[in-house]
UniProtKB/Swiss-Prot annotation:
Its main location: cytoplasm. The modification O-(pantetheine 4'-phosphoryl)serine is found at residue 37. 4'-phosphopantetheine is transferred from CoA to a specific serine of apo-ACP by AcpS. This modification is essential for activity because fatty acids are bound in thioester linkage to the sulfhydryl of the prosthetic group. This is Acyl carrier protein. One of its GO terms (biological process) is lipid A biosynthetic process. Pathway: Lipid metabolism; fatty acid biosynthesis. Belongs to the acyl carrier protein (ACP) family. Residues 2-77 form the Carrier domain. Transmembrane segments: none annotated. The gene is acpP. PANTHER family: ACYL CARRIER PROTEIN, CARRIER DOMAIN-CONTAINING PROTEIN. The keyword Amino-acid biosynthesis does not apply. GO terms for cellular component: cytosol; membrane.
Amino acid sequence: MSDVLERVSKIVIEHLDVEAEKVTDKASFIDDLGADSLDNVELVMAFEEEFDIEIPDDAAEHIQTVGDAVKFISEKVG
């Protein structure tokens, strides 16, 4: 498992209180993991803090799945 995926998964598990098995690349934060819009905002903020990056609002709107988050963060941190 990549470092980014591992760290994103840990944040998702902690913030959404879901089982690790449910956190997959294709898992939608809202549809599969039970997040609401406030949870999404909190996740984005947690990703920003964990990876010391800024995720613009327009980009945050497109981060709908675990895989989306991993891809965006991987591109930002190199």
